[in-house]
């Protein structure tokens, strides 16, 4: 975020800022009941910063991961138009008084001490409740994933990502080996659902790209043929993950 505020950010800085903001949103949303000191406004402020960062990282992923696969399957070299995200606008946003106040408020909360003396005793129960809910949201549709609407399928991808973030936040309270084993079983779900989602992002981008380059029709055909395969792979990954033993 400092690099963005200084006006020297590149694509990786944008990506890391988006990941950081995503993690914060997950924590504030799923752990909101853990403290009376959490300001409900923070989550929306963070969400707005996230939206302003745009979709440049998604486009980078299509260029570096999806396009090379399509070229390997016989497509001519494809060049996706670059959408310019004005760094100057982002610099102004991240240097604004509102953003600075948000960061300072989050830091003050992070370094504050909880007044409730029974907080530690209640923490494990709160963790179990939060993780149980997220875990259920990830696995509840495992047996009929392929029957869901695409928007519902992508919600499961987001929940899987949030589950990982929340586990990483509280991982120090549990045996490291147990946490790592569980996350290892979650990883295939994230990988397949992530690639499945990328295909739909690519489909939208390629539809627009056909207006200036007809070679993207080949890419569109490849994407449409690949989507059912990744859908089935995602369903299988979810079914396997459903059998994983929870550690909390």
Tell me what each language-model feature is.
Residues 1-248:
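Function-determining surface determinants
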């Amino acid at each position: 975020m400092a690099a963005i505020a200084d006006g020297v950010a590149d694509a990786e800085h944008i990506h890391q800022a988006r990941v950081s903001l995503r993690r914060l949103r997950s924590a504030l949303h799923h752990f909101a009941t853990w403290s009376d000191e959490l300001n409900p406004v923070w989550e929306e402020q963070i969400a707005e910063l996230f939206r302003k960062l745009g979709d440049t990282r998604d486009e980078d992923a299509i260029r570096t991961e999806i396009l090379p696969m399509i070229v390997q399957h016989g497509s001519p070299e494809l060049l996706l138009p670059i959408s310019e995200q004005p760094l100057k606008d982002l610099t102004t946003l991240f240097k604004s008084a509102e953003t600075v106040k948000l960061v300072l408020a989050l830091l003050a909360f992070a370094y504050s001490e909880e007044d409730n003396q029974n907080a530690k005793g209640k923490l494990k129960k709160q963790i179990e409740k939060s993780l149980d809910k997220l875990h259920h949201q990830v696995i509840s549709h495992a047996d009929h994933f392929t029957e869901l609407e695409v928007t519902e399928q992508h919600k499961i991808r987001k929940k899987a990502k949030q589950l990982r973030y929340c586990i990483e936040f509280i991982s120090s309270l549990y045996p490291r080996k147990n946490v790592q084993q569980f996350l290892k079983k979650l990883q295939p779900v994230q990988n397949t659902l992530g690639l499945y989602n990328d295909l739909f992002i690519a489909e939208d981008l390629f539809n627009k790209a056909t207006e200036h380059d007809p070679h993207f029709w080949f890419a569109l055909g490849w994407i449409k043929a690949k989507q059912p395969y990744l859908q089935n792979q995602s369903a299988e990954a979810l079914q396997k993950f459903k059998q994983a033993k929870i550690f909390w």
